[in-house]
Amino acid sequence: MCIYASRQTVCPYLTPFKVKRPKSREMNSSDVNFSLLQSQPNVPAEFFWPEKDVAPSEGDLDLPIIDLSGFLNGNEAETQLAAKAVKKACMAHGTFLVVNHGFKSGLAEKALEISSLFFGLSKDEKLRAYRIPGNISGYTAGHSQRFSSNLPWNETLTLAFKKGPPHVVEDFLTSRLGNHRQEIGQVFQEFCDAMNGLVMDLMELLGISMGLKDRTYYRRFFEDGSGIFRCNYYPPCKQPEKALGVGPHNDPTAITVLLQDDVVGLEVFAAGSWQTVRPRPGALVVNVGDTFMALSNGNYRSCYHRAVVNKEKVRRSLVFFSCPREDKIIVPPPELVEGEEASRKYPDFTWAQLQKFTQSGYRVDNTTLHNFSSWLVSNSDKKST
């Protein structure tokens, strides 16, 4: 679950992390064809990851299952129990499961079905929705238009979301794929609307879990925000011990809500090892991202995670990343700073700044927020001298 960018920046204003781009690339999205790659005896070396990144899982992660029905129905006792479990998970590793989340019956299953429909289209038809460099929305295969090594073994369809009207998800897909594929856009639009509504509820529950006097603080903070929706398709891989569907990373966004199919693949780094998050029928995975870690003043942990692949089965997941309004200052509630500016863990920043950092040649990992914060402080010091 990742907003991709490269491990080191080539953005001109991020001079501490400048690197030299390769002069040429072996592949790009127009020529990465996983159907053909699967027929080859070996996986191309561009898809190999370092040994430390592909270290095997050491077991299953026992995540709390948060039943949202009490919170959604206004039951204060059940809400407080849910908030307590959320707090414990977010302080430990930044992830938990939610059930009884209020989605319309059958919507999640239909969205997964539609994702299979899209990824089952011909390569030429999928490329009609090709992601233009610099844009959020579009289709990619292996992200080879951006990277030359450590490529993810996946195809993705990423769509920018903003609460409408207009219906930006549906409009983008219909404009690219044509009216005869209108159902794809309609279902994904409905699913994104439901995900966004759930995010607002989760933001309030997070505020309660932190003991904020104004329990709606985070809900209101994100009311005018946006989202990024991503469909992931992980084909079978002949050398899963060397490849990854998505490399180890923390999401730079606020919180991430993930729908898995029934194939194992999501792993979280917790208590010093990689641990598997097994799919559970009816449950959604919620991960804390870097932006919310900053909004919590470091009290809640950004979830470090990855996606592994296997030899036999296709795996699908649908992911919704929540983002604040681009120009809104990311600053924790005053009560989390204990009245002392010196206790601030991260400097003020905007989502636009962090997004530019992660989209300008920096591959997100578990040091993104630290590196970004260091650059902000360094740049501020230079301006003041």
From Swiss-Prot:
Alphabetical UniProt keywords: Iron, Metal-binding, Oxidoreductase
Expression across tissues: Expressed in 3-day-old seedlings and siliques. Detected in dry seeds, roots, old leaves and inflorescences.
EC class of the enzyme, as a word: oxidoreductase
GO molecular function list: gibberellin 20-oxidase activity; metal ion binding
Positions of Fe cation binding: 249, 251, 305
BP terms from Gene Ontology: gibberellin biosynthetic process
UniProt catalytic activity: gibberellin A12 + 2 2-oxoglutarate + 3 O2 + H(+) = gibberellin A9 + 2 succinate + 3 CO2 + 2 H2O; gibberellin A53 + 2 2-oxoglutarate + 3 O2 + H(+) = gibberellin A20 + 2 succinate + 3 CO2 + 2 H2O
Cofactor(s) required for function per UniProt: Fe(2+); L-ascorbate
SUPFAM superfamilies tied to this protein: Clavaminate synthase-like (SSF51197)
Domain of life: Eukaryota
Induction: Not controlled by the level of physiologically active gibberellin.
Pathway: Plant hormone biosynthesis; gibberellin biosynthesis
Disulfide bond entries: none
Active site (UniProt): 315
Entries under PANTHER family matching the protein: 2-OXOGLUTARATE (2OG) AND FE(II)-DEPENDENT OXYGENASE SUPERFAMILY PROTEIN-RELATED
Family, as annotated: Belongs to the iron/ascorbate-dependent oxidoreductase family. GA20OX subfamily.
Protein name: Gibberellin 20 oxidase 5
UniProt source species: Arabidopsis thaliana (Mouse-ear cress)
